[in-house]
């Protein structure tokens, strides 16, 4: 399963949603993670807190991931998740953007 984290303003949300739709069109099992907007404390360090503006588009199809699906790829927020990331980093399936374009994302099967 591929999980696309949605965060930022409307422009970023639209780009992340476009990636999600592309992955779905390629037949991948993809879901969106909107916890950046729903979990308390996730936007504390942001100067301009944002809202999930994709939800204003009523007929926009989007499948959201569950907390369990997210934890399976990146671990939990608590002590066990931190230990997993430190002691067994090979079990964590998280990709971080470093450039504008990453063609390898289309070859991933399990990634957050």
Where are these predicted regions, by residue range?
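N-terminal targeting/anchoring "stem" of glycan-biosynthesis enzymes
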Residues: 1-112
């Amino acid at each position: 399963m591929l999980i696309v984290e949605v965060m930022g303003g409307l422009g970023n949300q639209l780009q992340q949603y476009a990636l999600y739709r592309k992955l779905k069109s390629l037949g991948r099992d993809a879901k969106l993670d909107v916890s950046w907007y729903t979990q308390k404390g996730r936007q504390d360090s942001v100067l301009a807190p944002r809202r999930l503006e994709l939800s204003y588009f009523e007929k926009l199809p989007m499948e959201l991931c569950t907390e369990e699906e997210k934890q399976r790829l990146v671990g939990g927020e608590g002590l066990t998740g931190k230990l997993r990331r430190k002691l067994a980093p090979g079990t964590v399936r998280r990709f971080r953007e470093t450039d504008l374009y990453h063609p390898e994302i289309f070859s991933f099967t399990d990634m957050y």
